[in-house]
Amino acid sequence: MSSATTTLVEMRPMSLWRAVAQNELAWIGLILLALVVAAAVLAPWLAPRDPLEQDIVARLQPPSAEYWLGTDSYGRDVLSRLLYGARISLFVGFVSILTAMLIGTSVGIVAGYVGGLFDQIVMGVLDVLLAFPTLLLGLMIAAMLGANLQNLIIAIAVTEIAPFARVARAPAITLREREFVEASRSYGCGPFRIMTRHILPNMISDVVVMSSLWLASAIRTEASLSFIGLGVPPPAATWGGMIREGFENILDAWWLAVFPSLAIFAVVLGLNLLGDALRDASDPRSSAR
C-alpha cells in the first residue's frame, strides 16, 4: 500500500504538467509570463535610460522615436520605469505568495491532522481573516505598518495565508484516516514525518494550482496599494504608482496610465490562463462544468 501510494504521488505531478503542456491557453499564459519575467530580469540592459533620471525639458512627451512610451511629469522615461516596475511587482508577488504558501499550508496541515480544539481555534482565526476583502485587509495592515517594500510584502502575505490554510486543511482531515497513514503510525512514525512524507505530497498539486491563481491577486493588490500610496514609496518605479500619476494627468498624458495598466493586464491574464489549465489538469471534473 505504501509503495503504491508513493508511486501515485510521484506520477501525479508528471501527468499534471503533461496535461498542461497540451493546453493551448496554458501556452499563451506561459508566453505572456515569460516575456514579462524576461523584461524584468533584463531591465538593466533593456531600459534605454535610468528610470529615476529627470529631464524637466522633456516632461510629458508623447510616445515617439526618442521616447518609445513617452515621458512622465518629471521627464522620466516611461519604458524604463515600466521595465524596472516589473521587477518590483513580480518580486513582491512571488515573495508574498511564497510566504503565504509556506505558512498557510503548514498551518492547514497541522490543524487538519491534529484536529480538536487546536483546529477550532485556528479555523476561527482564519474565518476572521476571510471575513475581510483581500484589498481592505491589505490596506489596513499596510496602513498600520507603513509604506515600504518589506511591509508591503507582509501585508499581502497575511491576506493570502487563510486561503492556503483552508486548501491544505481539507485533504489533511481526509488523509489522516487513510490506511497508509495508519500503517505509518503503527511503524512508529511521528506526526511530523507523517505530515511531511505522506500528507503534504498528496496535496502539493492543489497548492501549486492555488499559488498560480493567487499570485495574480497578489500583483493586483500590490498595484492597488501602490496606487493609493501604501506601496513602495517614490521615486521607485512601481506599476501602481505609475497608474496613480497617470490618473492625475489622464487628460493630458494618456500613456502614463495605459502602459502600466496593460502590463498588469498581461501578467494577470497569463497567470489566470496558466492557473485555469493547472486546475483543469488536476481536477478534470472542473473543466466539464
Residue ranges and their predicted role:
Residues 28-31, 92-96, 125, 138, ...:
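Hydrophobic core positions of alpha-helical segments in small-molecule transporters
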